[in-house]
C-alpha cells in the first residue's frame, strides 16, 4: 500500500504524468484508461489536460463510485464506465486516440485487450515495470494486433521506486470484429510466438 505523502506523489501522480514522455496529449481528442483503479493515470492526465475527453474504465464498482467525485466537481469531458474492457470492444472498436493501462496484466493479454479500441494512427501506451522480458513477450501480440512499437522509454522514478518502461505502440490497421477473441481464449492462449 502506498500511504506516505511523498510516495503518493511519486508513485501515483508523478508516475501517471510520465506517460507524457512519449506522447503529446494536446494533439489528442480522447483517451481511455482501463483498469483505472483510483484514477491513475487517467484522472491525473485529465487534470493536466482539461480539454482531453477521458474515459476511466474499471470492472470494480467501488473504484468507479470513488471516482464519481470528479463528476460532482463538474469535470467536463469525463466518462466513468463500470465494466470489463473486453465488453467495450464492440461498441468502441477503433475509437480512441490513446488507450493506456497501468499495472493491469501481462503484455500479451494487455495488448490484445487494448489494441482493438485504438483508432488507426492512434496509440496504445503500456505503463510497465522493469521486466523487459515481459515487454519482449508482448511484441508478437503487438504485431498480430496491427501495431508497431515506436518507442520504449526506460527510466527510474527514484532509487526506491525502481525502473519503469513506457511502451508506445502505434496502430497501423483497423481491427475487424472477426479478430476479437473471447476473454477466456485471450487468457488461456495469449498471443505469443509459442502459441501460434
Description of each model-found segment:
Residues 1-26, 32, 62-76:
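Class I SAM-dependent transferase core
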Residues 121-131:
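Conserved beta-strand signature within the Rossmann-like core of class I S-adenosyl-L-methionine
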Amino acid at each position: 500500500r502506498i500511504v506516505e505523502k511523498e510516495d503518493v506523489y511519486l508513485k501515483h501522480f508523478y508516475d501517471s504524468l510520465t506517460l507524457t514522455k512519449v506522447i503529446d496529449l494536446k494533439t489528442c481528442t480522447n483517451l481511455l484508461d482501463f483498469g483505472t483503479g483510483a484514477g491513475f493515470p487517467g484522472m491525473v492526465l485529465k487534470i493536466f489536460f482539461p480539454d482531453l475527453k477521458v474515459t476511466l474504465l474499471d470492472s470494480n464498482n467501488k473504484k468507479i463510485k470513488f471516482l464519481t467525485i470528479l463528476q460532482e466537481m463538474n469535470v467536463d469531458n469525463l466518462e466513468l464506465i463500470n465494466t470489463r474492457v473486453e465488453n467495450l470492444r464492440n461498441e468502441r472498436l477503433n475509437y480512441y486516440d490513446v488507450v493506456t493501462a497501468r499495472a493491469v496484466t501481462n503484455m500479451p493479454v494487455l495488448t490484445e485487450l487494448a489494441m482493438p479500441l485504438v483508432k488507426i494512427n492512434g496509440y496504445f501506451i503500456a505503463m510497465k515495470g522493469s521486466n523487459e522480458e515481459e515487454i519482449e513477450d508482448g511484441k508478437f501480440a503487438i504485431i498480430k494486433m496491427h501495431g508497431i512499437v515506436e518507442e520504449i522509454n526506460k527510466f527510474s522514478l527514484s532509487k526506491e521506486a525502481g525502473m519503469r518502461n513506457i511502451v508506445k505502440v502505434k496502430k497501423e490497421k483497423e481491427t475487424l470484429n472477426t479478430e476479437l477473441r473471447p476473454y477466456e481464449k485471450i487468457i488461456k492462449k495469449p498471443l505469443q510466438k509459442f502459441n501460434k
